[in-house]
């Protein structure tokens, strides 16, 4: 070994070169069919052939400590002996780091040398065979795509059950089939890969989209579990975004058992159903009949029919009469009975009576998860409690509802998005607001939800309906 090679072994450059031997072969197959057979490679390594399997653990620890043991993702350092006869006898080897060379004892550490001297092991050449199954999605795609496309390799996608939903940029479209096949191979539980061919909502008021199947069957009937609830739906007919699970959970955590929540654009119930499971009364509306159908499926599946009421109408109409509907339910004495926990067998106390929980007279929260246009619905809150000022008297202790409205705005590090959102709320609500504490009239808390595009983010603005708005004369 030359002096420069020895120096490189101890340098970062040498380590990088060593690890490069595990990279897949470059297969610039372009937009053609994926040929998995081309992804094979022989990596020449050294191995410590341990004569007595009882010593494997000892030498593994020693070689790990000396950093001579192979440490490579998805590869076990313990392998069968390359000699089939010895392998049939159960003999094992420990794979060694690429900088250890079998015919060069000067590259061996003290543990290896001692093991050889004691005749407890021998250092032998080992041909490690790698194939398509070993490499990751990123490894395979990097070897297929031309270098000029390596800066932004498609990796993120939404999932809905067994469906991976991609939104490929134009320059990757020629490779869409290959990309989809590799995703299918490398992603657990994915059976179908689709690509969106238009913007969500571009052709549908229900936020559904046109798609093409890139790999797998055209099967869009999916099952999803989110926030401890099970959903089943046709992904091509309703809106679902797995990236919103944390936002769903954030708002659900704000709801208290026994409160009333009105979900204006409820979809199939990602807010409503888990909230119902928590003991929250939910009026859940969506104007898409398919969403309403699958919400009812989720309500029954998750056993929350006592708490969640599916409604199918325009969101503006829903807001106009939501308060009256809740108040009427309260006046009619609508309630749920919560069965008590059964007493332990050791106790002979009489069985306790079920707990009655009445629907309260007022709404605690409105949720408006339609970020493209929800702010434009805010004018509908004018007069929502007209004539019912007494419900919010000082003696009652009740507060006007909190509104949680999702929206899009600019991506910026300064106050620009907050000011933009407050200006739009002011315009449609007809009442001036500014960033601040949502419990203070005229102030709005803005939560940053997620990135949706390079210069666009999704936010959730929360505020209490001002008294001037809630008690205004109804139009």
Swiss-Prot record:
Its main location: mitochondrion. The keyword S-adenosyl-L-methionine applies. Gene3D superfamilies: Met-10+ protein-like domains, Vaccinia Virus protein VP39. S-adenosyl-L-methionine binds at residues 248, 286-287, 314-315, 369. PANTHER family: TRNA (GUANINE(37)-N1)-METHYLTRANSFERASE, TRNA METHYLTRANSFERASE. Belongs to the class I-like SAM-binding methyltransferase superfamily. TRM5/TYW2 family. Monomer. Specifically methylates the N1 position of guanosine-37 in various cytoplasmic and mitochondrial tRNAs. Methylation is not dependent on the nature of the nucleoside 5' of the target nucleoside. This is the first step in the biosynthesis of wybutosine (yW), a modified base adjacent to the anticodon of tRNAs and required for accurate decoding. This is tRNA (guanine(37)-N(1))-methyltransferase. It comes from Neurospora crassa (strain ATCC 24698 / 74-OR23-1A / CBS 708.71 / DSM 1257 / FGSC 987).
């Amino acid at each position: 070994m030359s002096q420069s090679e020895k120096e490189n072994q101890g340098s970062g450059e040498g380590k990088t070169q060593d690890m490069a031997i595990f990279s897949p072969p470059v297969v610039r197959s372009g937009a053609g069919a994926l040929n998995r057979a081309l992804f094979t490679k022989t990596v020449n390594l050294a191995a410590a052939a341990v004569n007595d399997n009882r010593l494997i653990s000892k030498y593994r620890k020693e070689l790990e400590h000396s950093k001579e043991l192979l440490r490579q993702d998805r590869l076990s350092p313990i392998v069968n002996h390359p000699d089939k006869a010895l392998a049939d006898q159960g003999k094992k080897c420990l794979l060694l780091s690429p900088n250890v060379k079998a015919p060069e004892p000067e590259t061996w550490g003290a543990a290896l040398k001692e093991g050889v001297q004691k005749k407890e092991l021998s250092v032998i050449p080992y041909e490690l065979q790698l194939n398509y199954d070993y490499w990751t999605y990123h490894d395979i795609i990097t070897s297929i795509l031309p270098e000029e496309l390596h800066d932004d390799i498609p990796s993120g996608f939404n999932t809905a059950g067994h469906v991976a939903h991609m939104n490929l940029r134009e320059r990757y479209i020629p490779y869409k089939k290959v990309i989809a096949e590799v995703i299918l191979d490398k992603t657990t539980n994915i059976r179908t890969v689709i690509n969106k061919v238009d913007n969500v909502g571009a052709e549908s008021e229900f936020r559904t989209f046109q798609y093409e199947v890139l790999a797998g069957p055209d099967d869009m009937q999916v099952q999803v579990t989110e926030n401890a609830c099970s959903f089943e739906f046709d992904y091509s007919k309703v809106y679902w975004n797995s990236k919103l699970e944390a936002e769903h959970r954030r708002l659900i955590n704000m709801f208290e058992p026994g409160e009333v929540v009105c979900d204006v654009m409820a979809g199939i119930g990602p807010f409503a159903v888990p909230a119902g499971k928590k003991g929250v009364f939910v009026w859940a509306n969506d104007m898409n009949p398919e969403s309403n159908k699958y919400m009812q499926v989720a309500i029954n599946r998750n056993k929350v029919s006592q708490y969640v009421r599916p409604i199918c109408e325009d969101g503006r109409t829903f807001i106009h009469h939501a308060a009256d509907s809740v108040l009427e339910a309260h006046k009619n004495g609508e309630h749920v009975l919560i069965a008590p926990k059964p007493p332990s067998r050791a106790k002979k106390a009489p069985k306790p009576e079920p707990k009655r929980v009445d629907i309260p007279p007022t709404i605690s929260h409105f949720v408006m998860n339609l970020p493209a246009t929800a702010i434009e619905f805010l004018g509908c809150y004018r007069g929502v409690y007209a004539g019912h000022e007494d419900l919010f008297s000082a003696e009652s202790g009740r507060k006007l509802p909190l509104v949680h409205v999702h929206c899009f705005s600019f991506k910026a590090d300064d106050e620009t998005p907050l000011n933009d959102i407050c200006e739009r709320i002011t315009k449609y609500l007809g009442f001036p607001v500014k960033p601040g504490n949502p419990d203070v009239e005229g102030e709005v808390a803005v939560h940053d939800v997620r990135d949706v595009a390079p210069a666009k983010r999704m936010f959730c603005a929360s505020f209490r309906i001002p008294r001037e708005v809630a008690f205004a004369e109804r139009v």
